């Protein structure tokens, strides 16, 4: 599971996801990418499930890059706890993903294999996604 080794502050505010992604919007490492079309919090468990699904389908051929990292702690109060008495303890980590962000990239496999691998990965994610091919890809 992905999470920061150490953070300056244990708890963070929720924030809001306005607009499109300002960075990480182009395929830069591999030949194929999976682009987010909606804003969402992607948990470290969802990222890991998508990674495992891709690796299983690609049979460890090629290379996968994970372009998002869960660096935001989400706190939660215990069940049946009364309101007040402070903020809950950090429960899990999320990556804030805005529309246009490339979340995963792949290299070293055919276009058909990459398409299917990303389709399987997209089923593990709570947002609409789009398969992207690098503009200068020769295949």
UniProtKB/Swiss-Prot annotation:
The UniProt record lists the keyword Ribosomal protein: yes
Disulfide bonds: none
GO biological process: translation
UniProt function note: Binds 23S rRNA and is also seen to make contacts with the A and possibly P site tRNAs.
Quaternary structure and interacting proteins, as annotated: Part of the 50S ribosomal subunit.
Assigned protein family: Belongs to the universal ribosomal protein uL16 family.
Protein's UniProt name: Large ribosomal subunit protein uL16
């Amino acid at each position: 599971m992905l999470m920061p080794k150490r953070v300056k502050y244990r708890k963070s505010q929720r924030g809001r996801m306005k607009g499109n992604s300002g960075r990480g919007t182009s395929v830069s490492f591999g030949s194929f990418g999976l682009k987010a079309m909606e804003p969402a919090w992607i948990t470290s468990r969802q990222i890991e499930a998508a990674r495992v699904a891709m690796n299983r389908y690609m049979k460890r051929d090629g290379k996968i890059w994970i372009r998002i990292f869960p660096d935001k702690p989400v706190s939660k109060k215990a069940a049946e706890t009364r309101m007040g008495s402070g903020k809950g303890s950090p429960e899990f980590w999320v990556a804030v993903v805005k529309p246009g962000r490339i979340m995963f990239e792949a290299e070293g496999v055919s276009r058909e294999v990459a398409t299917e691998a990303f389709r399987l990965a997209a089923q593990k994610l709570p947002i609409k996604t789009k398969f992207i091919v690098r503009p200068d890809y020769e295949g």
